[in-house]
UniProtKB/Swiss-Prot annotation:
HAMAP family assigned to the protein according to its UniProt record, in alphabetical order: PLP_homeostasis
Protein name: Pyridoxal phosphate homeostasis protein
N6-(pyridoxal phosphate)lysine modified-residue sites: K47
Originating organism: Mycobacterium tuberculosis (strain ATCC 25618 / H37Rv)
Keyword Transport tagged: no
Length: 258
């Protein structure tokens, strides 16, 4: 590797072993669920970790990472470009950037310039703002494809943690339909996080049922973003196609977000 990354041999060794362990864990979860591990994406959550970690993960074969703050993600992309170019590994355009945090409508324009996928879309007004921003970015050649969208579902109706209230009849369907009918967005599927006081098995079972119901209306919405470091096995059992892993892969957070 070029000088910038060769200065981090210990970190590369750490991530190499952690990634291998996480891939083995995911494979075991898929086998236990009778599923093909190839249909489940392992998404490293790199918020509060430096661009050097993203570059090392890229070198190890990871092509997608998750961020939760627009300012941090934008700065990291610029630094990653420099690191990958120096290491002759390409550029950050080879990385698929996922927005996994809550999205403010006034950040839609910025998000449209860097994110490939958004996991936390949960309101009609946000869909409208993102659609408008992505269409503009496409027209200005700032991006080359639609924004992939997971509609976030709230299983208990508590809006403080984000998500469309799945206990309100028709609420999830309306947001999914709005995304499906938009010009700049592509409906990937649903995302959900178990409520704090719920058993994960019960939560993911309910999320899977909601996803199955949505897929009956929107057959292309095959994605289910569910499961993190402490519950990915349960999520995989209930159909997750994308597990979001942070500290179990990367260790303690190393940066403060800008």
């Amino acid at each position: 590797m070029a000088a910038d990354l060769s200065a981090y041999p210990d970190r590369e060794s750490e991530l190499t072993h952690a990634l291998a362990a996480m891939r083995s864990r995911l494979a075991a979860a898929a086998e236990a669920a009778g599923r093909n591990v190839g249909e489940i994406e392992l998404l490293p959550i790199t918020k509060f970790f430096p661009a050097t970690d993203v570059a090392i993960l890229f070198r190890l074969g990871c092509r997608s990472v998750g961020e939760s703050r627009e300012q941090e993600a934008s700065a990291k992309m610029a630094e990653l470009n420099r690191l990958l170019a120096a290491a002759e590994l390409g550029h950050s355009g080879g990385v698929h950037w996922h927005m996994v945090g809550r999205i403010q409508r006034n950040k839609a324009g910025s998000l449209a310039r860097w994110a490939h996928t958004a996991h936390s879309v949960d309101s009609s007004r946000l869909v409208t703002a993102l659609d408008r921003a992505v269409v503009a970015a496409l027209a200005e050649h700032r991006r080359g494809e639609r924004l992939r969208v997971y509609v976030q579902v709230s299983l208990d109706g508590d809006g403080s943690r984000g998500g469309v209230d799945s206990t309100t009849p028709g609420a999830v369907d309306r947001i999914c339909a709005q995304v499906q009918e938009s010009e700049g967005l592509e409906l990937v599927g649903l995302m959900g996080i178990p409520p704090l006081d719920w058993d994960p098995d019960e939560a993911f079972d309910r999320l899977q049922s909601e996803h199955n119901r949505v897929r009956a209306m929107f057959p292309h919405a095959i994605g289910l973003s569910a499961g993190m470091s402490n519950d990915l096995e349960v999520a995989v059992k209930h159909g997750s196609t994308c597990v979001r892993v942070g500290t179990a892969l990367l260790g303690p957070r190393r940066l403060r977000s800008p």
